[in-house]
């Protein structure tokens, strides 16, 4: 009976040790796009605030262009003709400095509470 209690205690200890390490991995996995859309309207592209490029060679398994429109995050295929053309247009605009899409920074692990992004403040007023 005493050996069963010792075995149970060792199993409980192993579970407790394993839990914190798996929680550290979850914030990275939850920020990756798991599906991409192959179609996107030009009207929606006009409302993009931020664009990020997700590569398939890092922490994420799928290549994607992440578009931030208001409070939504849209994952679009980087092979979409409309996205490629839109990215070229954004880079060519005089008021943008370089490309509007930035590479997603990999390797930064955040604590569970620090996963939330701060809202962005824009100087232009929305008609809505």
Swiss-Prot record:
A GO BP entry: cellular response to lipopolysaccharide
Region (Disordered): 89-128
Primary localization class, coarse: secreted
Keywords of the record: Chemotaxis, Cytokine, Disulfide bond, Secreted, Signal
Cellular compartment(s): Secreted
Bias (Basic residues): 94-113
Function of the molecule: Chemotactic activity for resting CD4, CD8 T-cells and eosinophils. Binds to CCR3 and CCR10 and induces calcium mobilization in a dose-dependent manner.
Record's protein name: C-C motif chemokine 28
